[in-house]
Each structure stands twice: as C-alpha cells, then as structure tokens.
UniProtKB/Swiss-Prot annotation:
This is tRNA(Met) cytidine acetate ligase. It comes from Lactobacillus delbrueckii subsp. bulgaricus (strain ATCC BAA-365 / Lb-18). SUPFAM superfamilies: Nucleotidylyl transferase. Catalyzes the formation of N(4)-acetylcytidine (ac(4)C) at the wobble position of elongator tRNA(Met), using acetate and ATP as substrates. First activates an acetate ion to form acetyladenylate (Ac-AMP) and then transfers the acetyl group to tRNA to form ac(4)C34. It is found in: Cytoplasm.
Amino acid sequence: MSVVGIVAEYNPFHSGHEFLMNQARLIAGDDPIIAVMSGNYVQRGEMAILDKWSRARSAIEAGADLVFELPFSYAVQAADMFATGGVDLLTRLGAKNLVFGVEDANLNFEYFGDRISKIPRQRQEFADYSQTYSTQYNQMVAREIGHEVSEPNAILGLAYAVANANLGSPLKLSPVNRVGAGHDDILQREAVVQSASAIRNLLLNGAERSELEQWLPKGEIAAFDQEKVLPNWELLFPFLKYRLESASIKELQQIYQMSEGLEYKFKAEIHLAENFADFLRRVKSKRYTYSRLRRLSLYTLLNVTEADVLNSYDHVSTMLLAYSKRGRKYLKQQRKDFEIDIVSKVDRKNAQEGTLGLQVRVDRLFEQIVGADQNFGRRPLEVN
C-alpha cells in the first residue's frame, strides 16, 4: 500500500495546497492520503486564521483522506522540530511517501538530509551573536552539501529530509515544484496561486469574499463567511501586554525558550510598544528572527513553560480531525498497527495527558477568541 503523507498548516487552505494534493493523488492512486496539520496555532507563532476543523474539512474536500492534528508541542516550533513531529507522526500512521512543495524539486533532498544528519551536534551550535541561528545554520548547510538552500520551502523540505534521515529514512521523499507566488510574497493579483501570507493579509484587511474566489475553495470561503472574528496578533496584543506586565521576571524565566535575558527585554519594551508589530521591532536583534520572537511571544501569552513542553513528549498522541470514506476504511483496517494513540474524543482523562493535555489547554484562549469549542464535544468530521 502506497500511503502518501503531507505535513501542512493550510493557513488558509488555498489553490497551491490543492495543486500539491493533486500531485499527491497521482502518487497514491487509490491508496489514502494522510495530512498531518497544525491545529489552532501555527509555526510562525500566531493563531491560525481559521479553526482546525474548518481547515481539515477543506483538505478532505480537496482530496485528502485523513487529517490528523500535529500537536502544539511540534507545530509551534522552528523548522527542525516541526519537521520531526510531522515525519514521526506520518511514519507512525503508516505513510510510506512524503510529498512536499519546494522551489526546485530537482534537488537531491534524501542525499542532503543524510549528509546533514551525520554532522556532530556540537558543530550545529553557534555563538555568533551578530547573526540569527537560522542564518548560521544555513551557512553551515551550504558548506557541508555544497549548495545554498535559502528559499523558505526548500529550507522546510531540507528539514523534512534531515528528520527522515534521523528516524532511519522510513519515508520516500517526493518533492514537487511549487507554482505561483512565493512563500511570503506580497499580493500578485495575476497569479493563479497566491501565497498564504498574502491571502491572510487580504482577509484581515476586509477583502470582499468575491475577491478571494480565484485562490480559495468555496468551502473555505463559506467558513470565513461564518466567522465573526479572524484571530490575529493585534487582537491578542492587549492580552500579551497584561501577561508581561503582571508576570514576574522569575515567572517569565520559566517560559519555553525564554533565554539570554529576553525576559528583561520583553518586560521593558512592552510598556513602550503601541501594538504588536511595534513590540517585535523593539525586541528584535540580529540574534533572533521575527518568527522566533513571535513564537516566544505566543509561549508567553499562553504561559507555556519549558516543563510543559518537555512533559508533553512523555505521551504523544494525535487528534483525528476529519476523514473520507477511503480514510475510514484505512483506519478500520490499520488502526491496530499504528504506533500512536489516535484521539477521536476528548474526555476528562485524556485531556490531562501529554501532548493532548497541552493542546487542550492552549486551545482555551482560541475558543474565547472565536467563540466555539475546539476539543470537548467535537468528533471527527466525515466528509464525502
């Protein structure tokens, strides 16, 4: 069985994702496509613009057969941990092939991943405070493999390859050339495929839904029509300000990835910042990327500590969000062989455990923003 896996955020689901899904179907044939998707919080350190259930439905309608949630402990992380979580979950769920979009599908990702995975860990630790960690890491990669990997999707593809190599290469890697606008490009109205960032900006700036029809599926547009609030950092900024002003330095030092005195910088600059974008500019330095600072801001807002994240890895599970008829058949046949707990219903007991426990806790704030329960009382969506 040639089960194909995809790691995604679908923030939101757009025509570029649909293109990749079609490419995955060419590989899978009649076998299932499994998508492991970020939940209500995404890698760049912010709330998803649409809840996980709506995005999962769009993925099934576009051709996926099963959508599982990538736990918060992996989803809101730098590329290496994000990729590790995605590849590990897909492997445990029986996937044999990983399809992902990149700027140049001719690159030998399996070879690159194998080379980089063999680099001793101490050579991946950098002390140049005039550059970000990611810049120094990319420079090291270029030296090791003789090829500069700088495009955002290629960097993520390389992270998948390294994660796969570290796990013993359980998945065949199938990179696919992206089409349309780049990862963080500004709006290109003539493009058939628009970047998710540009689409989010359109939505947050009040674009007419008719303006989005060429880039978003009808089901996704209908979901946005039902939303009263689109989550974003400017909406959350007052809560972050309260959190930073009310917490002690000692409390902030317990926050996941709070290091090198950033707790003092955060606490000092929050008083002066007019909004979240201004706050990020004030705390930005050559040492940290904006994504790193957004993630740290999110951990702070949600009071996610180092202990919370480390303890969550003691019991890793994944929530089933949506499935097709083909997906249901696959689950029935293969579930007993999965090397991971599948959560179809959140209850008082499992809501206290591992990755699910942290996920349920952080979703509480998302629920307050959008006004809808995200875990308790929800069951996987069957989409035909």
